[in-house]
């Protein structure tokens, strides 16, 4: 599935193509997992990746700054196995360039988000999906 042209923010999807936005529809709102530009050692160029708090410290920083300049809502994803060292099994590497497999990375990345928000004069608020929906449908 090609999501490259999909909005990187909550949107009302078109009936003919759910990946593109149509006029505001109070009946349906899509909350995509947000992507930011990232680059790690094995990447030739920057790539859009889902915002994952289990990434190594610093991987998200530049992309998040760009994202927060244009967006108010961030939807991230983290899988439980990505923060447990025992799940990293690669005989060729001592560490993974992208995923940390450490719980501390979640804290580090959240702290980076808080620092960035303060620098950009943004408020941080953790919301339930129902709160986000009411915010977007009552604009």
Predicted regions located by residue number:
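Active-site-adjacent pocket scaffolds in enzyme catalytic domains
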Residues: 1-72
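C-terminal domain-boundary segment and adjacent tail
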Residues: 50-139
């Amino acid at each position: 599935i090609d999501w490259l042209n999909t909005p990187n923010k909550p949107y009302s999807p078109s009936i003919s193509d759910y990946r593109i936005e149509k006029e505001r529809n109070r009946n349906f709102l899509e909350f995509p997992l947000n992507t930011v530009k990232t680059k790690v050692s094995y990447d030739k160029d920057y790539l859009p990746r889902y915002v994952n708090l289990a990434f190594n410290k610093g991987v998200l920083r530049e992309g998040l700054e760009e994202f927060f300049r244009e967006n108010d809502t961030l939807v991230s994803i983290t899988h439980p196995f990505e923060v447990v060292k025992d799940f990293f099994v690669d005989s060729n590497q001592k560490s993974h360039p992208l995923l940390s497999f450490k719980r501390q990375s979640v804290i580090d990345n959240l702290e980076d988000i808080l620092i960035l928000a303060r620098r950009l004069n943004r408020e941080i608020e953790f919301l339930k999906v129902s709160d986000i929906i009411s915010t977007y449908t009552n604009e």
